[in-house]
C-alpha cells in the first residue's frame, strides 16, 4: 500500500533506491515527521524476491518493481573480435559475447561448439605480415649500407675492401628481395 501523509509522526519500513538507476539497495526504518512525505530515493513498497544476477528496479510512475538482469562486474569476450569487455551497466548481456576467454593466440569463436578454436587463417596472415615487415626492414637496412659504399665507388675513391663490401651487400639485398615471405628463409648478412 502506498505511503499516506499523516498528521502524526511515524516510523515505517522503507526500501532505498540508488539515485541513478532506481535499483533497490537496501531496507531500513525511517522516521517520518508529521505532514511530510517519504525521504528522497526510497519507497514503502517492498521489492519482489530478487534472483541472482538480477536487480529490482522501482518505476516511480507506475509504483511497481521490475526485475532486470544484472551482469555488472563481469568480464565477457566479444565472439567476433575476441576483445575483452567489462560490463558496467545493468541489463542483459550484449549479443555475441561469451564468458569464456579466447586464451591468447589466434582464435575464432565456433558458434556450434560454443568454444574458441584455432584460427589457422589468421595465424598464417599474421606470420605473412610479420615476414613482409622483416623483409622491408632488411631491404631498408641493406640499402642504407649500400648507399655510402656506392658513393665511394661512384666518386672513384673506394678501397678494395669497400668494393668487396658493396658487392656483398648488393648480393644480400637481391637475396632478401627474392625471399618468399610465405615460407621465409633469410640469407646471412654480410660481415
UniProtKB/Swiss-Prot annotation:
The domain of life is Bacteria
Q: Pfam families per the record?
A: Caudo_TAP (PF02413)
Q: Which InterPro entries match?
A: Phage_T4_Gp38_tail_assem, TFA_Chaperone
What PANTHER family does its record include?
PROPHAGE TAIL FIBER ASSEMBLY PROTEIN HOMOLOG TFAE-RELATED, PROPHAGE TAIL FIBER ASSEMBLY PROTEIN HOMOLOG TFAE-RELATED-RELATED
Q: Which family does it belong to?
A: Belongs to the tfa family.
The protein depicted here goes by the name Tail fiber assembly protein homolog from lambdoid prophage Fels-1
Name the species this protein comes from.
Salmonella typhimurium (strain LT2 / SGSC1412 / ATCC 700720)
Amino acid at each position: 500500500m502506498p505511503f499516506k501523509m499523516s498528521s502524526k509522526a511515524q516510523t515505517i519500513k522503507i526500501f532505498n533506491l540508488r539515485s541513478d538507476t532506481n535499483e533497490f539497495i537496501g531496507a531500513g526504518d525511517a522516521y517520518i515527521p508529521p505532514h511530510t512525505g517519504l525521504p528522497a530515493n526510497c519507497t514503502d513498497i517492498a521489492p519482489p524476491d530478487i534472483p541472482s544476477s538480477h536487480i529490482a528496479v522501482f518505476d516511480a510512475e507506475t509504483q511497481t518493481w521490475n526485475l532486470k538482469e544484472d551482469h555488472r562486474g563481469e568480464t565477457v569476450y566479444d565472439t567476433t573480435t575476441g576483445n575483452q569487455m567489462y560490463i558496467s551497466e545493468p541489463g542483459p548481456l550484449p549479443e555475441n559475447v561469451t564468458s569464456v576467454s579466447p586464451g591468447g593466440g589466434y582464435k575464432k569463436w565456433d558458434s556450434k561448439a560454443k568454444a574458441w578454436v584455432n584460427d589457422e587463417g589468421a595465424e598464417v596472415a599474421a606470420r605473412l605480415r610479420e615476414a613482409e615487415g622483416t623483409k622491408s626492414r632488411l631491404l631498408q637496412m641493406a640499402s642504407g649500407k649500400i648507399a655510402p659504399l656506392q658513393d665511394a665507388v661512384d666518386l672513384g675513391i673506394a678501397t678494395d675492401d669497400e668494393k668487396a663490401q658493396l658487392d656483398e651487400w648488393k648480393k644480400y639485398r637481391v637475396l632478401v628481395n627474392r625471399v618468399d615471405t610465405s615460407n621465409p628463409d633469410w640469407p646471412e648478412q654480410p660481415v
